[in-house]
Amino acid sequence: MNGAGTIQRLLASGLTIFDLTHIFYSHFHPDHTSEFVPFIFATKYPDGSRRKTPLTVGGGRGFLDFYEKLKGAYGSWIELAPELLNTIEFNNKKRDYRQFEDFSVETAPVAHNEESIAYRITSSDGYSAVYTGDTDHSETIIDLAQKTDVLICECALPDKLRVPGHLTPSLAGDLAARAEVRKLVLTHFYPECENADIEAESRKAYSGPLVLARDLMQLEIGL
């Protein structure tokens, strides 16, 4: 996910775009992908050789077509040399798995739109984090997130304002409780969440460690 403001926040954290080696998209809505074009453009110009490690970017089926259509609009401005960019697609109809050098990625389809997938990333020493992306309540997330160290879960709206395709605090709490996760991190708050007790609503179902995400927050996994 890299929606609006991601690059600025990355720089504020002390990192640069060249410190990132992998980007995985849950789906292609603009609030999740709007800085993909600036990211690729900033990688290429003024000198693409500044990137010393190839960038891998992926998403559910349809990502390659999504990228091709962006190139149809921006042309070579967002094309990187083949040795600098790897693009991959994950199956968005069933579970998928990829092994990388020092971590693995497992995905599962979720209930938001056609290409939507959730991710479970597991380090070589066995610690894991699950990111739901945008989703409605889904048994596939419960399966994917079983006993994960951290579940980073969307929580768009308070319970009383639930809409299809998104989670509320109590629904997110239910997923976390049933998956027996070690820590729940709620994120993707719409402005309506500012006037609700998100933690209390989540506690209707989940009693474990709970964090409300904020910009520039850093999470240590496995400690």
Each language-model region and where it sits:
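P-loop/Walker A phosphate-binding loop and immediately adjacent motor/lid segment at beta-alpha junctions
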Residues: 39-56, 111-117, 122-123, 164-185, ...
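Hydrophobic packing residues within well-ordered alpha-helices of enzyme cores
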Residues: 10, 36-39, 67-70, 141, ...
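Structured loop/turn residues at beta-strand edges in well-structured enzyme cores
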Residues: 15-18, 53, 83, 101-103, ...
